[in-house]
C-alpha cells in the first residue's frame, strides 16, 4: 500500500522536452518509475527519451491512460498546465515549478476544486513511494521502503528526514513534499490524513516552517482523530525575524500563531512528538515506534 503514487501509476511529464523536464524524467525512468510519455505543445508525434510526446494532456490520457502528471513548465504557463491536467482527467498533479504568480494560483486552485484530482505543490520536490515510483526531483538513493510516512514543506528537510529514518532501519512508505508557496494544492493536514489512512504507515514525520496555519490545523486534526499513529514534528525557521520571507514565499510570520515557537507549542499540546533540531528526527521516530 502507498499513497498518491505507486508502481501502477501511469506518469507523464508536462514540459517533457525542456531541460528541467528532460533531466528529471531521465532520473525518474532510471529509478524505475512507470513514465509513459510527456507533453510539449507542437512536438506531438515525436519520441523523447524513448517515450511518446503529445501535444496535449488529453491526448496522453486518451492514448496511454496517463493518471499522474508532473509539471516542469515555466512559471508564466504553469497554472494553465495545472488546469489542463485537471480538465483532461489526471488524478494526481504534481507541480514542481517555483515562482508561479499568486494570482495565477488563486485562479488554478479555484478552477480545480470541483474536479476529481489532487494537486501537490507548487514549488515542491514531489512525491516518492520508494521502490515503486519517484515523481519529483528528490535523490532516489536516499529513500528505501519501510513504515514511516513523511509530509514536508521543505525539499531538503524531506531528504534529511528520510536519510535519518532509513539509517534507523525503518524506511519510508511515501514521502510527500507539499511545497512552500502561500497557495498550495494539498495542505499538511490533508497529506497527514492520507498517511494516517494508509495501513502500511506506522508513524508520520511532519516537517513545517514559520508562516501560515497549516501545521496547527494538522496537529488539531491528529488530536481530534484520536492520535491513531505517532507523529514526529519539526518546525524550521525558529530564528527568522518577523515580517521577512525566509526561503519559501509562504514562510513569513504574520501573526503570533505563525511563529515556530507557537506552532511547536500547539503541536505538543496535540500530542505530537516535537523535536528542536532536524538532527533529532530519526532518533525520535525510532523511539516512538518502539
Predicted regions and their residues:
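Catalytic-core regions of core metabolic enzymes
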Residues: 1-290
